[in-house]
């Protein structure tokens, strides 16, 4: 893809999300989502292949369906309230339809099926945008209407997403699918706390974006897409493989890494609100995520991936100048747990 066209598309994606985040008018919100969707589809298939075309088509159909449901909900709400402002959510049917539309855009269960397939079929750089930036706009809209959302429906979807995010990643060897199921699980944690403390939900989003961006940066740098290629990274640059494994454990929420902080704060907040069964089930389900991350770490660091090929290995990367650039991001993604009291005070 032409670099200038790519920059224009990225600017349009950011503009569409910014319109959604800053708008208080339903039509402008819908328009922002449409701008975002039409700009990201070419980005998903920037490296033309049948697989990327299929992934972009699946993404387009899913997002178009969600936008259609969103517009239907906006019209229903307009009929009952007579206003276009987002703050006026008086109709329960419209509220439920908007929730379903935003859940489809986020890729939460039970509308999660497109996330692993689309992520697997696109380049790593496009996957980074899909699993990080594309979550901000729907979450910002949920933040504005969270008081009007059916709490039981929301919590059910959240718990189901955490469970599916764990179960789905258990038998995966492709790192992009593992990151996709990890995204589904993390979105479940954010949704679970949205009704109780939406600020904490956005703190979780910030930590998730930092960890996911660090992981994708290392995968892009090492051209790693599977467990086999990750295990071979030891022969190229051991520090890359080591940092990748530490970030994977942080994504799994293993203390004392950064990923443990939002889970700790969310469980604490739910317990304060006299909810004990939900955080217990969430913590148990999160062990599934932690299990496949630890298994991936073990198979990569302590064993060699089985292969019958006598392949010639590259012993080092040609260019390591990018490492100092991503080192601060990796440090925050793994060692920010001591900052927890500060976030608790700000919360």
Swiss-Prot record:
EC number, UniProt record: 7.1.1.2
Key word Transport present: yes
Bilayer-crossing regions: 3-23, 25-45, 59-79, 96-116, 122-142, 149-169, 201-221, 239-259, 274-294, 326-346
Main location: mitochondrion
Disulfide bonds: none
Cellular component per GO, a single term: mitochondrial inner membrane
Annotated GO biological process: mitochondrial electron transport, NADH to ubiquinone
Domain of life: Eukaryota
Keywords for the protein's UniProt record, in alphabetical order: Electron transport, Membrane, Mitochondrion, Mitochondrion inner membrane, NAD, Respiratory chain, Translocase, Transmembrane, Transmembrane helix, Transport, Ubiquinone
Localisation per UniProt entry: Mitochondrion inner membrane
Topology of the protein relative to the lipid bilayer: Multi-pass membrane protein
Stated role: Core subunit of the mitochondrial membrane respiratory chain NADH dehydrogenase (Complex I) that is believed to belong to the minimal assembly required for catalysis. Complex I functions in the transfer of electrons from NADH to the respiratory chain. The immediate electron acceptor for the enzyme is believed to be ubiquinone.
Family statement: Belongs to the complex I subunit 2 family.
Quaternary data: Core subunit of respiratory chain NADH dehydrogenase (Complex I) which is composed of 45 different subunits. Interacts with TMEM242.
PANTHER family, A to Z: NADH-UBIQUINONE OXIDOREDUCTASE CHAIN 2
Protein name (database record): NADH-ubiquinone oxidoreductase chain 2
Gene, per the UniProt record: MT-ND2
């Amino acid at each position: 893809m032409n670099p200038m066209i790519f920059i224009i598309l990225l600017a349009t994606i950011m503009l569409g999300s910014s319109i959604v985040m800053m708008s208080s008018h339903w039509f402008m919100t819908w328009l922002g989502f449409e701008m975002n969707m039409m700009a990201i589809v070419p980005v998903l298939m920037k490296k033309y292949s049948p697989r990327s075309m299929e992934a972009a088509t699946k993404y387009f159909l899913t997002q178009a369906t969600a936008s259609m449901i969103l517009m239907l909900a906006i019209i229903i709400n307009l009929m009952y309230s007579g206003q276009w402002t987002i703050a006026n959510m008086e109709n329960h049917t419209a509220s439920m339809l908007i929730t379903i539309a935003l859940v489809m855009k986020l890729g939460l269960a039970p509308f999660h099926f497109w996330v692993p397939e689309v992520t697997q079929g696109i380049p790593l750089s496009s996957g980074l945008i899909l699993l990080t930036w594309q979550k901000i706009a729907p979450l910002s809209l949920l933040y504005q209407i969270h008081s009007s959302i059916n709490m039981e429906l929301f919590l059910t979807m959240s718990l189901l997403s955490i469970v599916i995010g764990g179960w789905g990643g258990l038998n995966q060897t492709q790192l992009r699918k593992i990151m996709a199921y990890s995204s589904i699980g993390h979105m479940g944690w954010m949704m679970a706390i949205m009704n109780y403390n939406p600020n904490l939900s956005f703190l979780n989003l910030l930590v998730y974006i930092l960890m996911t961006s660090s992981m994708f940066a290392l995968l892009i740098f090492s051209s790693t897409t599977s467990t086999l290629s990750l295990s071979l990274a030891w022969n190229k640059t051991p520090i890359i493989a080591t940092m990748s494994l530490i970030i994977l454990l942080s994504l799994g929420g293993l203390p004392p890494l950064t990923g443990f902080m939002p889970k700790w704060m969310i469980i604490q907040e739910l317990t304060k609100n006299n909810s004990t069964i939900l955080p217990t089930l969430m913590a148990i389900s999160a062990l599934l995520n932690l299990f496949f991350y630890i298994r991936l770490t073990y198979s990569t660091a302590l064993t060699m991936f089985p292969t019958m090929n006598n392949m010639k290995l590259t012993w080092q990367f040609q260019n390591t100048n990018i490492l100092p650039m991503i080192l601060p991001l990796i440090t925050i993604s793994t060692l920010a747990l001591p900052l927890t009291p500060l976030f608790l005070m700000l919360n």
